[in-house]
Amino acid sequence: MKRDVLSITDLSKEEIYELLESAADLKAKRKAGESTEYLKNKSLGMIFEKSSTRTRVSFEVAMTDFGGHALYLNSRDIQVGRGETIEDTARTLSGYLHGLMARVMSHDTVEKLAKYSTMPVINALSDREHPCQILGDFMTIMEFKKKFEGLKFAWVGDGNNVCNSALLGSAIMGMEFAVACPKGYEPKAEFLEQAKALGGKFTITDDPKVAAKDADIIYTDVWVSMGDEAEQEKRLREFASFQVNTELLGVAKPDVIVMHCLPARRGLEITDEVMDGPNSVIFEEAENRLHAQKALILKLMR
């Protein structure tokens, strides 16, 4: 039966734990050089409206490791930008492919792709959510903290798509979530209401030190995301006091881990000292995107 993952909430707590176990197994097998050609002769289409280093490379490597094939499709390669509807594109690609991932400007696009295709569809980033990133993040948290229940997850910066998925995912997994954003940049009310319905415990503040106090995890992201360039000067001013630096780490737990979905703007949202310091798990987190996505691909396409 076809299954799509467009939001982290499309997965239950039990399924997330199963995916993390599968991801850890796949990671160990890759490190040991074991063959994992579970998707031989299967193809994954990858639609990119927004470019990405980590997303493209990790999904392509995943399909190579599985003995399958990944096809990169940007907006110049497909006819959607020249009049063909998303619905027709989804139906057509369903005849060629075994799965589709899409990194899109509008969440509506990935929803239509899922609705009109007969193959599984994965949201690899939309303006609403980034579930693949959060699966990699959760794998990293499990590696370093060995649990989720009772942890405090502090988000410092823009209440964006990654923040939305982190908020909802934390509610599912039983972590306390604290968001520190400048006024006007908080997660939208619908995501807060959804987190509350999932039993989530969260706080919203405009003081990074309040969010980071006794935190087990401090997470940040760029202040100016792709598509927000017109607001760059305004955002840099308003986020100036939301930097993740040594002073902020001082109010967190001594063994706090620092995370960032990358790419980072060093010297803006995070200092070199913290990014390259002993509390940083940022590059382990980046690698875990590969393993977590492999587990998801396998669950949906096998």
Swiss-Prot record:
Carbamoyl phosphate binds at S52, T53, R54, T55, Q79, R103, H130, P131, C132, Q133, C261, L262, R289. Its main location: cytoplasm. It is found in: Cytoplasm. The keyword Mitochondrion does not apply. Keywords: Amino-acid biosynthesis, Arginine biosynthesis, Cytoplasm, Transferase. Pathway: Amino-acid biosynthesis; L-arginine biosynthesis; L-arginine from L-ornithine and carbamoyl phosphate: step 1/3. GO terms for molecular function: amino acid binding; ornithine carbamoyltransferase activity. InterPro entries: Asp/Orn_carbamoyltranf_P-bd, Asp/Orn_carbamoylTrfase, Asp/Orn_carbamoylTrfase_sf, Asp_carbamoyltransf_Asp/Orn-bd, Orn/put_carbamltrans, OTCase_ArgI. Transmembrane segments: none annotated. L-ornithine binds at N161, D221, S225, M226. It catalyses: carbamoyl phosphate + L-ornithine = L-citrulline + phosphate + H(+). One of its GO terms (biological process) is citrulline biosynthetic process. One of its GO terms (cellular component) is cytoplasm. Its EC number is 2.1.3.3. Reversibly catalyzes the transfer of the carbamoyl group from carbamoyl phosphate (CP) to the N(epsilon) atom of ornithine (ORN) to produce L-citrulline. Belongs to the aspartate/ornithine carbamoyltransferase superfamily. OTCase family. PANTHER family: ORNITHINE CARBAMOYLTRANSFERASE, MITOCHONDRIAL, ORNITHINE TRANSCARBAMYLASE, MITOCHONDRIAL. This is Ornithine carbamoyltransferase. It comes from Methanosarcina acetivorans (strain ATCC 35395 / DSM 2834 / JCM 12185 / C2A). The gene is argF.
